Amino acid sequence: MDKKKIIAVLGATGAQGGGLARAILNDASSGFTVRALTRDVSSDKAKELAKLGAEVVAADVDDLESLKRAFKGAYGAYCVTFFWAHFSPEKEIANATAMAEAAKYAGLQHVIWSTFEDTRNWVPLSDSRMPTLMGKYKVPHFDAKAEANQAFTTRGVATTFLLTSFYWENLIYFGMGPKRGPDGKLDFTLPMGDKKLPAMAAED
């Protein structure tokens, strides 16, 4: 039987990375296995992934050398960042650059980079309908990820740029979930009128 190809998954104990890691581990016929990358290999979530068969390895997006070690011998990687941990476009770009540099160094065959579109392509900085933030962004957590795309392309890393939809878990993480009203009923409100919201569960 052919040896399974290793996919290094950043954010493996988070929503997006965790969903992917479990999907791979639960599909015995996929031909892939998971190297779960996390800053804390002793966390409960890391231990759960290990029980499912993942190789759990310590790595930090702020530490290029740790990423190089973690990517060594892997076929590919799933790269994702968590903007809300620092609220810094500069850090977002620096983290993506470290991932791309490590991927090139390790000779990965393929990378999936979880990114967003650049909102400035649709709402220019000159458009006053939305404020310009930090001097150069309309939606910093979108625009910075889009800027970071070039970290992979300029290094010649074979990359799929994944633009996923909003995921339902965000309603819980960001306090937008159902609220109990005076009558005891749970209400869920999202002021969007008749507009549609594409969404999925991160686990899917």
Locate the predicted segments by residue.
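Oxidoreductase cofactor-interface core, primarily capturing Rossmann-like NAD(P)-dependent enzymes
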Residues: D2-E48, D62-K72, G76-I93, E101-I112, ...
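Cofactor-binding loops of NAD(P)H-dependent oxidoreductases
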Residues: A59
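Short, conserved active-site loop motifs that form the nucleotide-linked donor/cofactor pocket
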Residues: G53-A54, T159
